[in-house]
């Protein structure tokens, strides 16, 4: 009987706890919608308070589990099924402390959450670079319970290949067939959220880590180290959470040799609470510490006056005169500042002198500071300003304990950081507009590239922010110059060559005429004429032989030719440079030249080397909108033979461009070009005879030559 009664009472307690949990906030509706980029949005509606969930992702089977603390479920249907390529089913269950939504997926996915009004939006999409995971008999997930059992029974956690919901890098969802457990690196991630107490909560998931982390504090940094837990470089990340208005400003997860290090950057006064929910899961809560405010403000209690009663009756009297009379009546020493001025009218009878002084102070907005038997009187605004300066100076001295941390510089040279105007504490004008305070100093250690700053915590924090802004890698630009030279050659020749040969025997006769004839009359009876057999135009001499009767042969040959040529030359120097840094590259020859100079009474001969190079000199400036401004000089020189009188000497043919231009990143800009064209026509002919209509074509030679040349200079810069 007692056992049954105990069970009934326990059941009532459980029901009461469930009712109280549900009253904190219930999930009333779940809706699913699609986005164009293959994303799904699961909209979870609440009736009261909204709880931002915490959860995890499993890849085998593909699930997303979300836990809502101190939340109940008020839904008629707690299992929702969908015919979708990504989302297959949503199951809702609850126990005494929380509610869980399990999103069953058809393929590995990832998620992100956002609070909008009385709803929590869950964005689901496929994991990047996912690979179907092989079966792993060593680790199995718990089978899904039926709908009715899930709604009533408490749920259990079975995590397989857990990855963080906010994955900064593209992580693979499964290992190879030989791997039976995921590596710790793929299960290491961080998440940040803000609770109702304005505290920053950092959740660290490192499932492959079995020990306890080492926690240390260095000024405003909390350093959590996981020994012998290696983090790949691709998973290193940094979260800027200053906009959440918590003591946490920045959270950084990085690799340090074989360890993983979590650095929490804080500000103000805070206290740390760390918890370990499960092996590999750690929660760090940074709470703002409440400060005890100094008592101050306006005292609303009624004033009491105990001074000797006096009577005053003045009309349009100086304030200083009234203060002098009150000083005599009270026996105190009153010192009024130069800014106390004006007149007033008083008519007081049997009033304590301290009450009269208080009335004057209120009427003229004066303030009193008493030190012993001396009272300082001044306008209230000036007195408040002076007091605030004194208070701030005391607070600065009280809270400005000097510290001297080491600030490592990773990219820039530490010698360049103090050259920044904000760090120059050598102010000769007296107007200190510097970052270092009057008692601060900066030391440089070039060996370790480290700054050692001695100053207050607030100044050190400003130093850290400034170094974060300055110690960044410089932007780089690949500058490429294309020098394109094209030449078209065209020539045409037309002419005729002809000739004749003949032989004749003559008996006791002489030739009628002869031109260019080798004639001879010897012992024989032969006469022989031998003109040149051919004549190629233009002919300087005409050859012809004749006789009264002869026989021979005529030669006639037509000469015609036409040539067409196209050449293209591409020169392509390229150089990589940093932003606002000059870069230079060149390739070519150094040609010796003999130079004669006059010195004294004679001449001296020296040999000088002149460059004939293909070169590029450029300075790039990247603008904030992505444009690139280039100051560029391009040279393309080539040696060639030149005629100097009757001699041939070596000279240099140059093509040069010097300009400044702006082009978008990845674009191509033609910054200049040269066009040359030489037209030549030649004609050689026989005088007089070549003008005859019958023989004009055969007694002249004509030629045409037209070789145009072009050179273009192109710049296609590309930011890396």
From Swiss-Prot:
Question: Entry's PROSITE patterns?
Answer: T2SP_D (PS00875)
Disulfide bonds, which pairs?
none
Q: What does this protein do?
A: Required for type IV pilus biogenesis and competence. Could function as a pore for exit of the pilus but also as a channel for entry of heme and antimicrobial agents and uptake of transforming DNA.
Q: Which family does it belong to?
A: Belongs to the bacterial secretin family. PilQ subfamily.
State where it is primarily located: membrane
Q: Which domain of life is it from?
A: Bacteria
Asked if the record carries the keyword Iron, the reply is no
From what organism does this protein derive?
Neisseria gonorrhoeae
Please state the span of the N-terminal signal peptide per the UniProt entry. 1-24
InterPro entries in the record, alphabetically?
Answer: AMIN_dom (IPR021731), GspD/PilQ (IPR001775), NolW-like (IPR005644), NolW-like_sf (IPR038591), Pilus_4_PilQ (IPR013355), Secretin/TonB_short_N (IPR011662), T2SS/T3SS_dom (IPR004846), T2SS_GspD_CS (IPR004845)
Mention any Pfam family matching this sequence. AMIN
> What is its subcellular localisation?
Cell outer membrane
What protein is this chain from?
Type IV pilus biogenesis and competence protein PilQ
Asked whether the keyword Electron transport is assigned, the reply is: no
Subunit structure and binding partners: Homododecamer. Tetramer of trimer.
Region called Disordered, residue ranges: 697-720
Transmembrane ranges, per UniProt, are none
Which UniProt keywords are listed? Cell outer membrane, Competence, Membrane, Protein transport, Signal, Transport
**Gene Ontology CC:** cell outer membrane
Biological processes, Gene Ontology terms: establishment of competence for transformation; protein secretion
């Amino acid at each position: 009987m007692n056992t049954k009664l105990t069970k009934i009472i326990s059941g009532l307690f459980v029901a009461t706890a469930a009712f109280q949990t549900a009253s904190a906030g219930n999930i009333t509706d779940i809706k699913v919608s699609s986005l164009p980029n293959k994303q799904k949005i699961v909209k979870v509606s609440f009736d009261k308070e909204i709880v931002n969930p915490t959860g995890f992702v499993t890849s085998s089977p593909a699930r997303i589990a979300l836990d809502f603390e101190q939340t109940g479920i008020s839904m008629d249907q707690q299992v929702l099924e969908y015919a979708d390529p990504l989302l297959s089913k949503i199951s809702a269950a609850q126990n005494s402390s929380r509610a869980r939504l399990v999103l069953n997926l058809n393929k590995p996915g990832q998620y992100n959450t956002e609070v909008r009004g009385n709803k929590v939006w869950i964005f689901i999409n496929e994991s990047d670079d996912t690979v179907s995971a092989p079966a792993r008999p060593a680790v199995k997930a718990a089978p899904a319970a039926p709908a009715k059992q899930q709604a009533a029974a408490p749920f259990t956690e079975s995590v397989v290949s857990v990855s963080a919901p906010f994955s900064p890098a593209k992580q693979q969802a499964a290992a190879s067939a030989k791997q039976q457990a995921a590596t710790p690196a793929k299960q290491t991630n961080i998440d940040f959220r803000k609770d109702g107490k304005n505290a920053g909560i950092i959740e660290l998931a490192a499932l492959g880590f079995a020990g306890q982390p080492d926690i240390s504090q260095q000024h405003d940094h909390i350093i959590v180290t996981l020994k012998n837990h290696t983090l790949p470089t691709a998973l290193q990340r940094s979260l800027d959470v200053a906009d959440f208005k918590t003591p946490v400003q920045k959270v950084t997860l990085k690799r340090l040799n074989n360890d993983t290090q979590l650095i929490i950057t804080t500000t103000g006064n805070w206290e740390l609470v760390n918890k370990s929910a499960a092996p590999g899961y750690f929660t760090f809560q940074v709470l703002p510490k409440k400060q005890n405010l100094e008592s101050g403000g306006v005292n609303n209690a009624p004033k009491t006056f105990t001074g000797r009663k006096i009577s005053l009756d003045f009309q349009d009297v100086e304030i200083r005169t009234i203060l002098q009379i009150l000083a005599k009546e009270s026996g105190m020493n009153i010192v009024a500042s130069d800014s106390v001025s004006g007149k007033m009218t008083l008519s007081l009878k049997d009033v304590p002198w301290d009450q009269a002084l208080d009335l004057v102070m209120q009427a003229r907005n004066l303030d009193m500071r008493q030190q012993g038997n001396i009272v300082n009187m001044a306008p209230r605004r000036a007195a408040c300003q002076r007091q605030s300066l004194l208070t701030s100076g005391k607070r600065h001295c009280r809270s400005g304990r000097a510290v001297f941390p080491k600030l490592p510089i990773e990219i820039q040279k530490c010698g360049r950081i103090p050259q920044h105007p904000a760090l120059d504490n050598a102010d000769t004008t007296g107007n200190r507009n510097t970052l270092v305070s009057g008692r601060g100093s900066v030391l440089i250690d070039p060996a370790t590239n480290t700054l050692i700053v001695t100053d207050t915590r607030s100044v050190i924090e400003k130093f850290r922010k400034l170094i974060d802004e300055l110690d960044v890698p410089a932007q780089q630009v690949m500058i490429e110059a294309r020098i394109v030279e094209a030449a078209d050659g065209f020539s045409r020749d037309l002419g005729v060559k002809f000739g004749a040969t003949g032989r004749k025997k003559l008996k006791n006769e002489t030739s009628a005429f002869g031109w260019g004839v080798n004639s001879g009359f010897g012992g024989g009876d032969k006469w022989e004429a031998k003109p040149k057999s051919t004549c190629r135009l233009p002919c300087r001499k005409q050859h012809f032989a004749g006789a009264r009767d002869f026989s021979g042969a005529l030669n006639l040959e037509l000469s015609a030719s036409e040539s067409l040529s196209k050449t293209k030359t591409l020169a392509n120097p390229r150089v990589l440079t940093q932003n606002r840094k000059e870069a230079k590259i060149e390739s070519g020859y150094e040609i010796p030249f003999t130079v004669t100079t006059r010195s004294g009474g004679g001449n001296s001969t020296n040999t000088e080397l002149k460059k004939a190079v293909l070169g590029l000199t450029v300075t790039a400036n990247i603008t904030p909108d992505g444009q690139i401004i280039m100051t560029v000089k391009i040279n393309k020189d080539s040696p060639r033979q030149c005629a100097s009188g009757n001699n041939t000497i070596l000279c240099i043919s140059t093509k040069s461009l010097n300009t400044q231009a702006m082009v978008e990143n990845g674009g191509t800009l033609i910054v200049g070009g040269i066009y040359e064209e030489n037209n030549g026509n030649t004609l050689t002919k026989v005088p007089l005879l070549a003008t005859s209509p019958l023989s004009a074509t055969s007694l002249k030679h004509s030629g045409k030559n037209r070789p145009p040349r072009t050179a273009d200079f192109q710049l296609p810069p590309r930011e890396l």
